[in-house]
């Protein structure tokens, strides 16, 4: 059984491969889910629903905080939000696939909990469990979807605040998931709840970027960029694009910091990021935002100017950028830039119908418009449909859109099924997943976090996995796995 602890990742010695001179990156997505149960005689508290989901996990792991055999972290966050943090991914498409594997894992847990609720009490025989991959509940509480990017340590926080934030805020015109607030469809789920730009706190405030220094890698080489401004997407395209476009912008920043020059994105610093965020939430691509330099522009125009700079950078550094995406099965630099240009052109043309096949808020808008054209639709019904779109357990709207070719998908069910139990390749997730899978079939007591694997009993032994890019076993790791093999053999030979 596992025991969990958090590692500060403070290294004594450097990693073998620091990737300080290339653009290789580690990606990760953390998703908190909302839960509720309907069709029961008495209301059920969300925390009780969440604990019901995690009962099998607790029986197996003796904790609501564990790692699974694909290397990802599964846990019950503060309050009543089940959370899934994907294992380290080497490219955007692996991050997408890992995120969808988390969705499938949560769905299976939710439907299993629903079955047990129905069987536990005749009054609950029609219980329906809802598991929402969104960022706000009907009571106005917000929960997050956080992106993680491994960034070279020489990229300072000032550059992140003044260069990256304008991009992150304005990318929501095509990555926003949309939220019906009772009167209108807003463009994002999360923007209304963000009240700070950059901060190390997440409990007292909701910053756009969290600066708590937990790289889960060699801290002399890297920092972990923890992006909080962003929505939980159902659209596979939106998830892929938010990771892929952010990667290209980060590559520009790293090159500038490495070379001691500017990125050409400094001119786009915002006068008031919070105000810009709120404006985009209500007005989308055409929201007017003030720049620190004194002029104003629209969110769409700012994205267009940023894309031009990225295209120019890619023209001069194409080989290095392509090398950073060499393992990506879905996208290369040309595809990312082409899709970026395409979506901005569709936004400029106000072509919501075409956008609805890949952009979550546009998909909702088109569907809502069709309903309203057929007759009166109440705000309560639209709110219900908005939630249904994000319900991965019993929702019907999003699966129906996919089945009818109205929402584009990039990976199939078989790939997602395999990713539930298979770690993303080319990262230390391979080693962690192999360790967890082996340990879970023994009576050994083991300990696990992002950088350390540890046996507690029958022997005390650990292996440190500090380099997230390293997927080859070390001597420490081989010795650890050997002990697990012995423990499994001893268990097999034990008398019944």
Curated annotation (Swiss-Prot):
Role of this protein: Catalyzes the covalent attachment of the prokaryotic ubiquitin-like protein modifier Pup to the proteasomal substrate proteins, thereby targeting them for proteasomal degradation. This tagging system is termed pupylation. The ligation reaction involves the side-chain carboxylate of the C-terminal glutamate of Pup and the side-chain amino group of a substrate lysine.
Q: Which organism is it from?
A: Bifidobacterium animalis subsp. lactis (strain AD011)
Does Ligase count among this protein's keywords? yes
Pathways involved = Protein degradation; proteasomal Pup-dependent pathway; Protein modification; protein pupylation
Example of a GO biological process term = proteasomal protein catabolic process
Question: Which PANTHER family does the record cross-reference, listed alphabetically?
Answer: PUP DEAMIDASE/DEPUPYLASE (PTHR42307), PUP--PROTEIN LIGASE (PTHR42307:SF3)
- State the similarity comment: Belongs to the Pup ligase/Pup deamidase family. Pup-conjugating enzyme subfamily.
What is this protein identified as? Pup--protein ligase
Tell me which UniProt keywords the record has, alphabetically: ATP-binding, Ligase, Magnesium, Metal-binding, Nucleotide-binding, Ubl conjugation pathway
Q: Which residues are Mg(2+)-binding? A: 30, 75, 83
Which Gene Ontology terms cover its molecular function? Answer: ATP binding; ligase activity, forming carbon-nitrogen bonds; magnesium ion binding; ubiquitin-like protein transferase activity
Q: What is the lineage of its organism?
A: Bacteria, Bacillati, Actinomycetota, Actinomycetes, Bifidobacteriales
Q: Which reaction does it catalyse?
A: ATP + [prokaryotic ubiquitin-like protein]-L-glutamate + [protein]-L-lysine = ADP + phosphate + N(6)-([prokaryotic ubiquitin-like protein]-gamma-L-glutamyl)-[protein]-L-lysine
Positions of the catalytic residues? 77
Q: What else is on record for this protein?
A: The reaction mechanism probably proceeds via the activation of Pup by phosphorylation of its C-terminal glutamate, which is then subject to nucleophilic attack by the substrate lysine, resulting in an isopeptide bond and the release of phosphate as a good leaving group.
Give the gene name.
Answer: pafA
Q: Where does ATP bind?
A: 73, 86, 450
The record's EC number reads 6.3.1.19
Any Pfam family the entry gives? Pup_ligase
Asked if the Swiss-Prot or TrEMBL record annotates the protein with the keyword Metal-binding, the reply is yes
